[in-house]
Amino acid sequence: MFVDQVQVEVQAGKGGDGMVAFRREKFVPFGGPAGGDGGHGGSIILYVDEGLRTLMDFRYQRHFKASAGGNGQGKQMYGRAAEDRRIAVPAGTTVTDADTGEVLGDLTEPGQTLVVAKGGRGGRGNMHFVSPKNTAPEISENGEPGEHRFIKLELKVLADVGLVGFPSVGKSTLLSVVTQAKPKIAAYQFTTLVPNLGMVQLDDGTDFVMADLPGLIEGASQGVGLGIQFLRHVERTRVLLHLVEMDPDNGREPLDDYDQIRKELGAYDDNILKRPELVVATKMDLPGAAERFADFKAALLARGVAADHIFEISSLTHRGVTPLMHKTAEVLKTAPHFEPKQAAVKTADYKYQPEPALKVTRDSDGTFVLTGDKIERAFKMANLDHEDGAMRFARQLRSMGVDDALRDAGAESGDLVAIDDFTFEFVE
């Protein structure tokens, strides 16, 4: 099993601003406030798409933003609610808050959804702020900011196809040709120290996951080299592509190589030998390779290996690669699935401790700076374009304990106070 992980940024839409407006119609002398509410901002919603197998699409787009709600209008007209931004993920995706480590959810069933960033509510228009003392309020709210966060998507991927063979037979090269994976490639044993994973996408829309499994050597089933670790990966694949190199100068016989790998696979688990297998002769661009392949193919046919399961390719010239991939996709259609044994997972309890609602600090120039989720939200929703709105915001600050907090921090009348990009003077 391989873990595919990616971090993405999500920004939900801001709510639409409420409107300050008054009813002005002929024969209606005291129409009163008629400012409508803003529309709700769009949320970011993940949903399970059973057609997806990997998180590959997130390699190309890692920032997602939903639309803002429409602003309120006069005549008590509400702003348009924004559409939610829906993002497809494969089944088995675990979603975690990148900053806190909190698991937001596990998406396992087709159609299952998870809201990862909630859209802001629309600000209220002035029709909501009528009181006996203020029958014509010039007060409205800006839309609430949408949630913004970084999330980690983690998917445990089972490879559909496993590339097996001796070291340096061309597994990593083939993977790099048929996928966008960039494995480390060199001509020495155990170049691949961890399995490389790639998605093969054919021109007919078919796709499957391919794993380049590190080269096996004699004794792998007894743990020689990195054998046992990699044989565990092999047992989870549905189809094997068994690569055998035809290089006349490698000092080995192709049929002996083929038999040795089959022996190690069988020694580890007989059931692996029952998996569908395509035999792939590699490095066919080398001089003398054609003659070696003719003898190798004849020996395989004599053993009962189907002719349409034997391929010759050159990853250098791409010869034979496309037919091999199409045959692999065809075999996969009828290949059974193999569920991995679930290992116990050790988990640690984690509880996120939110920041204090209000924090007062002082800049080098003497300005007192107010921070905290609650106060910043109140500021962003305050419409300070009208005196009534500014007075309402001042009352909100006082009710949150801002005045007392500033005094405790040493603020005196006339000192400057900043919230975000807004600066005002503290008055006792």
Swiss-Prot record:
A GO biological-process term = ribosome biogenesis
Cofactors needed by this protein, per the record, are:
Mg(2+)
Residues the entry annotates as binding GTP: 165-172, 190-194, 212-215, 282-285, 314-316
Domain OBG-type G residues, every copy = 159-333
> Do you know which PROSITE patterns this protein is assigned to?
G_OBG (PS51710), GTP1_OBG (PS00905), OBG (PS51883), OCT (PS51881)
State the compartments where it is located: Cytoplasm
List the SUPFAM superfamilies hit by this protein, alphabetically.
Obg GTP-binding protein C-terminal domain, Obg GTP-binding protein N-terminal domain, P-loop containing nucleoside triphosphate hydrolases
Query: Where is the OCT domain positioned along the sequence?
Result: 350-428
- The enzyme class is hydrolase
Enumerate the InterPro entries for this protein.
Answer: G_OBG, GTP-bd, GTP-bd_Obg/CgtA, GTP-bd_prot_GTP1/OBG_C_sf, GTP1-OBG_CS, GTP1_OBG_dom, GTP1_OBG_dom_sf, OBG_GTPase
Q: Which residues bind Mg(2+)?
A: 172, 192
Which residue intervals define the domain Obg in the entry? 1-158
Instruction: Quote one Gene Ontology molecular function term.
Output: magnesium ion binding
Q: How does it assemble?
A: Monomer.
Q: What does the sequence similarity comment in the record state about its family?
A: Belongs to the TRAFAC class OBG-HflX-like GTPase superfamily. OBG GTPase family.
- Please give the name of this protein: GTPase Obg
